[in-house]
């Protein structure tokens, strides 16, 4: 069993990279990847650890971009986390998204909600703030009772306090990963709620720009969707990957390795990636 989609406190997870490794070992995984949002900060910490010889680790990232008027995510595996252009672009994206967070904070404060940057950072000024941090703060302040309520009432794309992320072209995203020596993979293709036809066209278009794989196995994918993605993966000669999309207590129903229970990502997929 492997898990190629995991988030730590370096983005919107609630466990540190070291704690992630401890959980991976406790689960007896064959291999894993850390794929924090728009940052490679956790990779060095994991590489500095004394990992078991039989545990495979592949550096990763999850980058947000835009397609068909919606936000999509592209995973990058085997990236050179020291690549200058990669880090320059990530810093630029983070600066723009930091301003987006300030804009959302201002909207909340105008309506009297006690949302501040300090509360969102929760003691870590270097954290990459996402809407999950807003949800956690809304719950901590007693404004919402759950993450689902926070997103449906305050943070969803049609909500008053939502501010879109700065546009990032998927072609540029793919090129960024490729130029950093990485393997670009479309994350959770069915989570964007495109039609089957649009999803297939998206995969086809991205393949022409350098997409190398699709995330077939994911906590949100049911067996019918997995079967469909397997079909498209073979049709377009792409790699298959999979992972839980673990975020710790921010998504408490998702566990490393097993997702919501039935998830099983075959071991050979990490070997395919590494080869």
Feature roles, as predicted:
Residues 2-29, 43-81, 90-93, 172-186, ...:
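Charged catalytic cores and adjacent phosphate/nucleic-acid-binding surfaces used
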Residues 87-96, 121-124, 160-161:
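Flexible, glycine/proline-enriched loop segments at strand-loop-helix junctions
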Residues 95-122:
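Conserved phosphoryl-transfer catalytic core
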Residues 127-189:
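Conserved acidic, metal-coordinating active-site core of Asp-based
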């Amino acid at each position: 069993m492997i898990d190629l989609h995991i988030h730590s406190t370096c983005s919107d997870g609630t466990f540190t990279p070291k704690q992630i490794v401890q959980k991976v070992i406790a689960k007896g995984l064959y291999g894993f990847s850390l794929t924090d949002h728009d940052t490679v900060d956790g990779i060095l910490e994991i590489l500095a650890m004394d990992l078991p010889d039989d545990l495979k680790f592949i550096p990763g990232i999850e980058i947000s971009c835009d397609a068909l008027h919606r936000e999509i995510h592209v995973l990058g595996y085997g990236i050179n986390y020291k690549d200058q252009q990669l880090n320059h672009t990530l810093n630029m994206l983070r600066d723009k998204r930091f301003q987006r967070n300030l804009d959302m904070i201002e909207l909340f404060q105008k309506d009297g909600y006690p949302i501040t940057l300090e509360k969102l950072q929760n003691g870590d000024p270097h954290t990459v703030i996402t809407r999950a941090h807003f949800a956690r703060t809304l719950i901590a302040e007693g404004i919402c009772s759950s993450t689902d309520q926070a997103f449906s009432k305050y943070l969803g794309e049609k909500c008053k306090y939502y501010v879109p992320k700065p546009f990032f072209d998927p072609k540029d995203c793919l090129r960024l990963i490729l130029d950093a020596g990485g393997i670009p993979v479309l994350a959770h293709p069915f989570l964007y709620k495109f039609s089957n036809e649009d999803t297939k066209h998206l995969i086809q278009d991205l393949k022409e720009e350098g997409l190398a794989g699709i995330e077939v196995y994911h906590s949100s994918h049911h067996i019918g969707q997995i079967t469909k993605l397997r079909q498209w993966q073979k049709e377009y000669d792409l790699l298959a990957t999979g992972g839980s999309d673990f975020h710790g207590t921010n998504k408490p129903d998702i566990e490393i390795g097993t997702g919501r229970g039935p998830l099983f990502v075959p071991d050979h997929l990490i070997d395919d990636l590494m080869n």
